Amino acid sequence: AIPGEAVMHDRPVGRGYVRLRCTGAHPWPGVSETGAIHPAHEFHYASLEGLPPGLPHAYEMVRGHGLDGINDGLIFGNMVAGFTHLRNVANTPWVGRFVEFVRSRRSQMMAAGC
């Protein structure tokens, strides 16, 4: 489980179009080059609070709120958790990369006898 607490608010914490800069920490190979900027959107009434410092993030917020006004895409194990919604378009082909990642993890687990 993510080491934090989801808190609901009366008003939206983040809403509208955002721009994300890739940090290079994304666990799905080839999702994007470090520093690449992607358009996306967010709309959420929740925030994630009480996270320990130093957890890696897949994205820095150029515009928008994300998880904390600075970052989005918390990386925890094999998971990328965030509030931003990315479209699968030519400059952000995340669906194919996700499927590749799942297949590689499955192969690794089968090879390890799991």
Label each region the model flagged.
Residues 1, 40-43, 79-84:
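Short hydrophobic-aromatic micro-motifs
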Residues 71-114:
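Acyltransferase
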Residues 22-75:
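Catalytic beta-strand/loop cores that center a nucleophilic Ser/Cys/Thr
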Residues 1-30:
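Cysteine-nucleophile active-site neighborhood
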Residues 11-13, 52-55, 92-95:
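Short conserved micro-motifs at the rims of enzyme active sites and ligand-binding pockets
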Residues 7-9, 47-50, 87-91:
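Short, acidic Gly/Pro/Ser/Thr-rich loop/turn segments
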Residues 4-5, 48, 103-107:
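Generic secondary-structure signature for well-ordered alpha-helical cores
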